[in-house]
């Protein structure tokens, strides 16, 4: 009896809960949702019963068989769950659905949600997603069901269960990290903080600056690229910091940070990477471009090298004398974070036996590291080393770190800071940042900064980008996180480029926590073993 009750509870949770977790469940003429759960048999839910439940709250006898196995609070929330639209632009959804990654994501869901029991539901799902997105009521689960182009939706519970368990595991990891590194703070401790917002590295520095735009030439690209050079009004030679942006970004994404660092006495070069900028990514979403191309992994770090070469040999000598090109730092976000780690010494090592790269085994979802690693394998290169000896320190924000693996990331030999958002759904923190931090050599001057509830978008310039993501994924206003990034990057490069060790005081928790606000909190970690991390996520 207990077995049957557990089965029924799981059955209802999977079928009804999956609609919310796996929103690509489309439907137009769907009349029923059918699923098989051996050895108990075949079951189905009438779409009309669900629709009536959402509109009136009435539960049919057939639907009651499933709903009565759910807790009352979940039953009460279900109508809203099924009818609340996702806050996504329909044009962006349509573009994404026709893109390389979008197709891969929908094909993965199509393994578990089908129009025919023996066939991937990709085409039916994609058509229903796009049609539902343009419905006046928006992209809701019920609209997806109504737009599904076949009468029956076949659900493979084994596949759906696997996806739900993966999402559940990521959520549990996030909770474990929050509990371990962000303990509940007493009101008395909060009141003891005395934060002077007018001092510290988060405050604009004393130097004014000028900005100029230059071109650079990466011979692997079909056209010249651009970078903005910010220089402080200082006559002596100063260190240079290079900023590398991520997907769907450009030179404006971190302009606020470039201005801040320049005001503290650094020269800053902000590069535009043509292969992943706003225009390129918009084309990718339209389906006219592929991403990631195998050469993206090579060309983006090479962009930085060619910018340094341009500054070293072809810029006005008067400018050259004001920039120390042997004391260079790099800071990058997302794919730019990968670039930072690669230039710092991280090596890409091919995995020719990677079964997840085989088409039938790919479960991409939004695992950009695995997707990028699979494209790297297409290059038929055993190893890729892109370190530049001019670079002496690196910051990687929300990087794709897993792509390097333990051996590749351990090749880094310069001071490195990894900044990770605990709520990053695009590049999950445990796999992509925390484990790579653990893999860095213990003798390295290394830092891991966790930002709660930081997301993949928490440090980006507001209002930029073409990614179709809802506000709940973007998180709190990024402007609330700017002071933290300004303080971290200024202090880090003051210590490791400008040789001003007194700034280490700002790279301690006592100082960082003074920057905590209602939106974001942070903590800095210097040492974490694999055993300690495993203990945290196993709790």
Language model features with spans:
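N-terminal cap/lid segment of alpha/beta-hydrolase-fold proteins
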Residues: 184-236
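Gly/Ala-rich beta-loop-alpha elbow adjacent to hydrolase catalytic centers
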Residues: 246, 332-340
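Mobile cap/lid helix-loop segments that gate and shape the active-site cleft of serine hydrolases
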Residues: 351-404, 414, 423-425, 433
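Active-site-adjacent alpha-helix of alpha/beta-hydrolase-fold enzymes
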Residues: 411-482
